[in-house]
Amino acid sequence: MQVAFSPGAEIKFEGANNFRELGGYRAADGRQVKYGLLYRGGNLDLLKSEADHARLASLGLREILDLRSAGESAAHPDPAVPGAHYQRVCGMRNVDGTEMDFSGQGIERLRQEKKAFERSVGRPVHDFEWFSALYREMPFRNPAYHALFALLEGRRVPVLFHCSCGKDRTGIGAM
C-alpha cells in the first residue's frame, strides 16, 4: 500500500507522532527506496483508537523491530499487529555492551556512564558532547542495526522499526 508521495512523509496517527514512510529516498547510486516497504516511528503503545490500529494494520507489516530497552518495552508494550512478527533488540548500548535503558530505573545508570566518560577524558563534559560520542559509536557493532539489515536483506518487508520517540535510535537506523 503506497501511503505517501514524498520521502520521509509523516503518516498521521491520532495517538502517535513521528511515524514516517521511508520510501522515495535516493541512494548514492541513484536507485530509489520503494514506497510501502520501510517505516520508522515512535512508541506504538500510544496508538489507542480503532482508527490508529486500522491504519497500522493497513500497512501490511511483516516485521516490527522494537529498538527500546527491555524496561521501556515492558512499561509500554507494543500492541499486537496482525500478520507482523515482533522482535526487540535494544538500539543503544552501554560501554560494557548492556542495554542502555531510558526508562525511569535506567536514568541512574546513564548518569554513572556519563561520569565514567568524564573520567576517561579527564574533565567534565556537556551532555551534547557525551551523547555525540555515544552516537558516533551507535551504528557499529550494534545488534539492533544488524537485525534491521538482516530483515531488509531477507526481504522481510514491509518493516517498521521504532523506539520511544522515533528520533535517536530510530533516526540512526533510518540513515
Listing of model-derived features with the role each one plays in the protein:
Residues 1-160, 173-175:
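Cys-dependent protein tyrosine phosphatase-like superfamily
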Residues 165, 169-170:
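Ser/Thr-glycine-rich phosphate-binding loops at phosphate-binding pockets of nucleotides
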